Amino acid sequence: MEQTEGVSTECAKAIKPIDGKSVHQICSGQVVLSLSTAVKELIENSVDAGATTIDLRLKDYGVDLIEVSDNGCGVEEENFEGLALKHHTSKIQEFADLTQVETFGFRGEALSSLCALSDVTISTCHGSASVGTRLVFDHNGKITQKTPYPRPKGTTVSVQHLFYTLPVRYKEFQRNIKKEYAKMVQVLQAYCIISAGVRVSCTNQLGQGKRQPVVCTSGSSGMKENIGSVFGQKQLQSLIPFVQLPPSDAVCEEYGLSTSRTPQNLFYVSGFISQCTHGAGRSATDRQFFFINQRPCDPAKVSKLVNEVYHMYNRHQYPFVVLNVSVDSECVDINVTPDKRQILLQEEKLLLAVLKTSLIGMFDSDANKLNVNQQPLLDVEGNLVKLHTAELEKPVPGKQDNSPSLKSTADEKRVASISRLREAFSLHPTKEIKSRGPETAELTRSFPSEKRGVLSSYPSDVISYRGLRGSQDKLVSPTDSPGDCMDREKIEKDSGLSSTSAGSEEGFSTPEVASSFSSDYNVSSPEDRPSQETINCGDLDCRPPGTGQSLKPEDHGYQCKALPLARLSPTNAKRFKTEERPSNVNISQRLPGPQSTSAAEVDVAIKMNKRIVLLEFSLSSLAKRMKQLQHLKAQNKHELSYRKFRAKICPGENQAAEDELRKEISKSMFAEMEILGQFNLGFIVTKLKEDLFLVDQHAADEKYNFEMLQQHTVLQAQRLITPQTLNLTAVNEAVLIENLEIFRKNGFDFVIDEDAPVTERAKLISLPTSKNWTFGPQDIDELIFMLSDSPGVMCRPSRVRQMFASRACRKSVMIGTALNASEMKKLITHMGEMDHPWNCPHGRPTMRHVANLDVISQN
């Protein structure tokens, strides 16, 4: 017996070649993976042949037949024999040609693999041939039948019963044909968008019914026109063209790129993307197409970056994206995966930096647009003042000693109008501070409040101040709104800074701060804003650390408002009333210099006298202790091995706790749980064998009510006065027609006109309404996307789920409600009837493991 086993082992270890037929089937199954891959290979062959018209015909979504016809150059008769043989191609002759290949195909595997997986028939006619030829191939790619076949120039490839030579895959293919079909259509849409000057059409025929158009393009030469042909003109209204910008220094630093060493003009990116305004995006990533040298691909990093940047401006939607990256073919490796969808790219970080900089620049310019209502304002005296936006953006002319007088009366009126407008914003009048001559300047200094942190360093750049000099100038910063002035008035009253009577008619001076300061000193709340103190500075020495030059305000004759400097006041400084100051205060005497500041922050080594003490230590006692611990650990090992729940009750371990519950608790166990009581009028304590659980009574009841509403509620429909036309693609329209019952349960009703053109057959006649909730076409798009992935499965739009979650919350048992034993048992039993009992619709956990009684008793 032992001798026989040894012989069989030796035979199993022998290395032998696999027969050619098995190799062909194994490798072919790795080339053609799905319906979309098969269609992709045939479409690429037609485009490589120079076709301007490509017609794709499907029967039963591609299960029975896939047929692609084109008007390309056709196949010459001398190439018939090698047409469907493995690794036979006219695209390349050697490996070196791979870097210069410009066609989609180059490996010579597509037709050979299709022959191994299905029945393939090809009819073709070359431009030099007088009549076409029909070729029938066997599963090895060899011609079994060759007959004359009259047809125009071009090629038609028919693939029947795809995957039928692989029984398991064929059954799986039939079962998931709707998903396969949806993926195929998305791949086809990518080729329709990028193929300029090529008219692509696709039809599907169910049984003996009519051929239903799926996609149809007009053969336009531009990408924008192709997008409109595939997705409709409405989609174009929300798109903006991609504008490429060179990578910024900040983005280059983020990706570890050197701006001096990065190659210039390596990539050229073109395409379109959704506007960042809410409503312009989509609820899913179903319309995102990326191309490298016009080859459709799936660049995961690029896709992730585009969505992340878009979510910076529109958190709740995804963009429609069509981007084509043009780059030298020597910088690209397309021979990575069988379907050629994964592409390796040199300088990928540079491409990401270019995309991020460009997208941020595009969205910033779009997000910063604000529509301003031109409304008249009242000045202090009650007169109307017209708001001129263009005039407000101009700097206010200063009245300097050497400035020329105004030449035009129109200019004087304009200045007067703006001055009166600024006075209208001055809601808190204070006494005007007189000018002290050319040798002095006024400095408005802001002291940090007790909540404000102390700045760590002085600004090192040269400070430029804007303002006006003179005793009659009354300024308000254009960045100050009326609300800000009101907040400032409140602060000054609270801190005792108001020093004028209510009847004073003189305006207060609020010089404008340089824009470079605003980012360093943000005001988070009225309570956190700095209280202000006006100090008259004679010889003010504004000297940045490390420089020998001093910047004196009197050299410029400007009134300035300075930022709080470092260490200007302790962090716990209280607010105080304004006191009279001497006319000349030398701020530099009160401020610690750079040297003293840095010296206070440096740790100084201190010499310490340490006393040495002998410690008694026994190695034998330590070894004895270690043996005892190991023995105790061995005893407890089998006792602790049965612990099923180890996650803590904390937000950071919610996912781990949920995974443990899903693994260890089945639906039938809820009925077996023993009710121990109610804790804190909000939680039910249950016991299952030796495990104690805590159940949130509100969350558990809310989830049960939510699932019941999801399953059984039929939304009431509000009929429209006139049917509404939907801007759907042919594929989305087909999905809608096939799932009309699910739409009706969600409150949407349609009228279907079979004789109408495709994309215009379905019209909306009623919408769901429920009290204050209204729904619209965007919910229809979301349902179509969900049904494309799971056809025939009952699903709800996200806004319907939100409505059900709100209703379930209001009708559930609330925290603080006392429950008797039967009511608590009812809630626990309901948890066993749910599909997902671990979280309420708003994300709160319903149940957590508390303790194991065996572990507690042992301890």
UniProtKB/Swiss-Prot annotation:
Record-linked InterPro entries: DNA_mismatch_repair_CS (IPR014762), DNA_mismatch_S5_2-like (IPR013507), HATPase_C_sf (IPR036890), MutL/Mlh/PMS (IPR002099), MutL/Mlh/Pms-like (IPR038973), MutL_C (IPR014790), MutL_C_dimsub (IPR042120), MutL_C_regsub (IPR042121)
Positions in coiled-coil regions: none
Annotated positions binding ATP: N45, D70, E109, A110, L111
Record bears the keyword Nucleotide-binding: yes
GO MF annotation: an example: ATP binding
Annotated localization: Nucleus
Motif Nuclear localization signal location, chain numbering: 574-577
Subunit structure: Heterodimer of PMS2 and MLH1 (MutL alpha); this interaction is required for the stability of both partners. Forms a ternary complex with MutS alpha (MSH2-MSH6) or MutS beta (MSH2-MSH3). Part of the BRCA1-associated genome surveillance complex (BASC), which contains BRCA1, MSH2, MSH6, MLH1, ATM, BLM, PMS2 and the RAD50-MRE11-NBS1 protein complex. This association could be a dynamic process changing throughout the cell cycle and within subnuclear domains. Interacts with MTMR15/FAN1.
Family: Belongs to the DNA mismatch repair MutL/HexB family.
Cited function: Component of the post-replicative DNA mismatch repair system (MMR). Heterodimerizes with MLH1 to form MutL alpha. DNA repair is initiated by MutS alpha (MSH2-MSH6) or MutS beta (MSH2-MSH3) binding to a dsDNA mismatch, then MutL alpha is recruited to the heteroduplex. Assembly of the MutL-MutS-heteroduplex ternary complex in presence of RFC and PCNA is sufficient to activate endonuclease activity of PMS2. It introduces single-strand breaks near the mismatch and thus generates new entry points for the exonuclease EXO1 to degrade the strand containing the mismatch.
The protein's name: Mismatch repair endonuclease PMS2
Gene: Pms2
